[in-house]
Swiss-Prot record:
Signal peptide: none annotated. Residues 10-21 have a biased composition (Basic and acidic residues). Residues 1-32 are annotated as: Disordered. This is Small ribosomal subunit protein uS12. GO terms for biological process: translation. GO terms for cellular component: small ribosomal subunit. It holds the Pfam family Ribosom_S12_S23. It comes from Azorhizobium caulinodans (strain ATCC 43989 / DSM 5975 / JCM 20966 / LMG 6465 / NBRC 14845 / NCIMB 13405 / ORS 571). The modification 3-methylthioaspartic acid is found at residue 89.
Amino acid sequence: MPTINQLIRKPREAQKARDKAPALQSSPQKRGVCTRVYTTTPKKPNSALRKVAKVRLTNSYEVIGYIPGEGHNLQEHSVVMIRGGRVKDLPGVRYHILRGVLDTQGVKNRKQRRSKYGAKRPK
């Protein structure tokens, strides 16, 4: 515990807020190329095969992005758009891949929350 005099000589330094999505470099989205598309298992107590992709961004960061929705068409060398947002039960996955943008197709037969999954309005 510092004394009053010590605090007058050298005030307390405010802690800097840590960026939750550093690879975006303050952009809303970033473009990148898939280097590997694979499935991984979530941590306890959940159980599934979550679809993820390793993406090399235009700023040469390499990040892991989650592919939301049922089914996807991504493979190696697909060009994707990435946004921030982690997946709580997948350690190391801090980004989401946007559906219906660039090489990523929207989710088929999606009726609700369509804008989040790049699905057109059904006729």
